[in-house]
Amino acid sequence: TLESLLIAKELLDRHEINRFAVVCLPHLCEQWQNEIKDKFGLDAEIIRSSTISRLEKKLRPDQNVFRDIPYQVISIDYVKQGNKRNIFLDHCPDFVIVDEAHTCAKPTGANKYQQQRYRLLSDLANKPEQQLVLLTATPHSAQSEDFQSLIGLLNPKFETYQHQNS
């Protein structure tokens, strides 16, 4: 957590970015918001179904939360589907931290469109100027296809890489 925020802060200080988003599981939103405030003094807004009405009331009609709120903590389950997903992909910050990225792996045997979280990350990773940090403290499981689906976001060749046992 801290290391990814240090990267964001460094990019902010260098004026290489002027906003960022953390995409995380719903129950981790407050923890991320507190870390951002306590460690860096930045006021991040939590974006999820229970906060969206309040946030939108603060904005002008021509604004949207993903483009016009500089520091965002977003519930992945709020933003993974439908119109919200498309608006996020169109207007999200250039720097996005994805916490618990292992929960976004493509399920073994499934095609990539069967998993909404994976599809969101895949589309995000394919944006040309997107900077993406994937965080996970969960050890690599025996399901190599799941792991390959995540590293395939970094380079599509990795998703089809066949490991040779020696």
Regions found by a protein language model. Give the residues of each.
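A short helix-turn-beta junction within AAA+ P-loop NTPase domains corresponding to the substrate/partner-engaging
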Residues: 147-160
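Conserved helicase ATPase motor motifs in RecA-like P-loop NTPase domains
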Residues: 102, 124, 128-143
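Conserved AAA+/SF3 P-loop NTPase catalytic/coupling segment centered on the Walker-B
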Residues: 98, 144-147
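Charged, alpha-helix-enriched surfaces in structured cytosolic catalytic cores
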Residues: 27, 142-145
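Alpha4-beta5-alpha5 "output face"
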Residues: 89, 140, 148-151
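SF2 helicase/translocase NTPase motor core
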Residues: 1-5, 9-127, 158-166
